[in-house]
Amino acid sequence: MSKTLSLQLPWVEKYRPQVLSDIVGNKETIDRLQQIAKDGNMPHMIISGMPGIGKTTSVHCLAHELLGRSYADGVLELNASDDRGIDVVRNQIKHFAQKKLHLPPGKHKIVILDEADSMTAGAQQALRRTMELYSNSTRFAFACNQSNKIIEPLQSRCAILRYSKLSDEDVLKRLLQIIKLEDVKYTNDGLEAIIFTAEGDMRQAINNLQSTVAGHGLVNADNVFKIVDSPHPLIVKKMLLASNLEDSIQILRTDLWKKGYSSIDIVTTSFRVTKNLAQVKESVRLEMIKEIGLTHMRILEGVGTYLQLASMLAKIHKLNNKA
């Protein structure tokens, strides 16, 4: 690969795992996939979990290990959020399933449906028959955020694997590998900021790392929060723990609201900060989270005003005074 092309390639693609052993987190599920690769007989499967934790990548790694050199011809990947309708099942998927290929003995073609929970009910119903007719030659892998949006008849035909959110340690491990390979200048608070904003989403973490390097060169907390354009947690923490309500409201108005952060930005960062407020008693912290949650609910209902946030701070200030 030329240096120019390497620079243009997003790091999330450049450092995408190629084998199952390279995937971080969800060890038990990855162990099951490695056993499937070893046995050589892949069942239909549904992999569910939040975005950016390696669901689709895991299926590609499994396909690489099962099909070897036949991978390019033997795998069809469709993003079901784009190709959602019944025509895709009748045309692309059916034609691929009918196609004759010379694969290693005992191996099957693989159809990967990313974001399968976005498929229409009609398309999912049509897929039932296709799966039955071509199960001898083709296996299906569904990657989705919510497995309950896959119709019951498809679920009953599949092994269901659930991926949990990646831990901060898992995300940090992969970031440090990339930082070493790319010779990135960073500070510890910069890494903490990337992990904080990613919330267990590896894809988001790697994209934020590359964006910060491209935009500022140095990965520190201030640069990361400028890139991701979310409220700085230290400012939010100061707002939540201010000794009097007037100071809290002043921080909200001057450092957050007037700088253009939305109600959702402020309330979600407040939630993440509050979860980790070790200096606040757990009982008080839980009440604070409850108030933040109620405010979040009102904002999602369409009342995302400054007044809602000020009311939230007044209630949190009252809780802090009781403590």
From Swiss-Prot:
InterPro entries named among the record's database cross-references: AAA+_ATPase, ATPase_AAA_core, DNA_pol3_clamp-load_cplx_C, DNA_Rep/Repair_Clamp_Loader, P-loop_NTPase, Rep_factorC_C, RFC_lid
Positions that bind ATP: V12, V24, G49, M50, P51, G52, I53, G54, K55, T56, T57, N145, R203
Gene3D superfamilies to which the protein is assigned, alphabetical: 1.10.8.60, 1.20.272.10, P-loop containing nucleotide triphosphate hydrolases (3.40.50.300)
Any one Gene Ontology cellular component term annotated for this protein: DNA replication factor C complex
Gene Ontology molecular-function annotations: ATP binding; ATP hydrolysis activity; DNA binding
Pfam families per the UniProt record, alphabetical: AAA (PF00004), Rep_fac_C (PF08542)
Keywords on record: ATP-binding, Cell cycle, DNA replication, DNA-binding, Nucleotide-binding, Nucleus
Subcellular compartments: Nucleus
Record SUPFAM superfamilies: P-loop containing nucleoside triphosphate hydrolases, post-AAA+ oligomerization domain-like
GO BP terms in the entry: DNA damage checkpoint signaling; DNA repair; DNA-templated DNA replication; leading strand elongation; mitotic sister chromatid cohesion; sister chromatid cohesion
Disulphide bridges: none
Record text on subunit structure and interactions: Replication factor C (RFC) is a heteropentamer of subunits RFC1, RFC2, RFC3, RFC4 and RFC5 and forms a complex with POL30/PCNA in the presence of ATP. Component of the RAD24-RFC complex which consists of RAD14, RFC2, RFC3, RFC4 and RFC5 and associates with the checkpoint clamp DDC1:MEC3:RAD17 complex. Component of the ELG1-RFC complex which consists of ELG1, RFC2, RFC3, RFC4 and RFC5. Component of the CTF18-RFC complex, which consists of CTF18, CTF8, DCC1, RFC2, RFC3, RFC4 and RFC5. RFC4 interacts with ECO1.
Note: Present with 2760 molecules/cell in log phase SD medium.
Its biological purpose: Component of ATP-dependent clamp loader (RFC and RFC-like) complexes for DNA clamps, such as the POL30/PCNA homotrimer and the checkpoint clamp DDC1:MEC3:RAD17 complex. During a clamp loading circle, the RFC:clamp complex binds to DNA and the recognition of the double-stranded/single-stranded junction stimulates ATP hydrolysis by RFC. The complex presumably provides bipartite ATP sites in which one subunit supplies a catalytic site for hydrolysis of ATP bound to the neighboring subunit. Dissociation of RFC from the clamp leaves the clamp encircling DNA.
Family: Belongs to the activator 1 small subunits family.
The name this protein goes by in its record: Replication factor C subunit 4
High-level lineage: Eukaryota, Fungi, Dikarya, Ascomycota, Saccharomycotina
